[in-house]
Amino acid sequence: MIKGIQITKADNADLLNSFWLLDTEKGAARCLCAKGGYAEDQMVALDELGAFESRDVELDVAPSVRVEGGQHLNVNVLRRETLEDAVKHPEKYPQLTIRVSGYAVRFNSLTPEQQRDVITRTFTQSL
């Protein structure tokens, strides 16, 4: 089974706040992002990470579409409730940045209509 985690405490400082996909059956981990020491998509054995504490990150994995052999995975590291709370209480989330059509933008700089649209598009249950 594959699960997503964010490392919150580790003996290795390069792991702090990094995001990983763990495959416990294969004993492997894939780096999604880290401040340093690990490259994006780098695969390592789980025991190479050493001692760490983490929090689970919900994975939203939809069936991928193959186009000329390519695949796409969209990993959302926010919950719907977080964005809805940011709409109601923008002062609590001044640094909340999202990605829209390849551009990074502060969520609070969007109009209320755009914010609702982002929430609706990001957290669909079915097509």
UniProtKB/Swiss-Prot annotation:
Gene3D superfamilies according to UniProt: 3.20.70.20
Entry's Gene Ontology molecular function annotations: formate C-acetyltransferase activity
Ribonucleoprotein recorded as keyword: no
Gene Ontology cellular-component annotations: cytosol
Pfam families: Gly_radical
Stored InterPro entries: Auton_GlycylRad_Cofactor, Form_AcTrfase_GR_CS, Gly_radical, Glycyl_radical_cofactor_GrcA
Membrane-spanning parts: none
Keyword Ribosomal protein in annotation: no
Residues recorded as bearing Glycine radical in the entry: 102
Domain Glycine radical as annotated: residue spans: 5-127
Keywords assigned: Organic radical
UniProt function note: Acts as a radical domain for damaged PFL and possibly other radical proteins.
Protein name as catalogued: Autonomous glycyl radical cofactor
Organism whose genome encodes this protein: Edwardsiella ictaluri (strain 93-146)
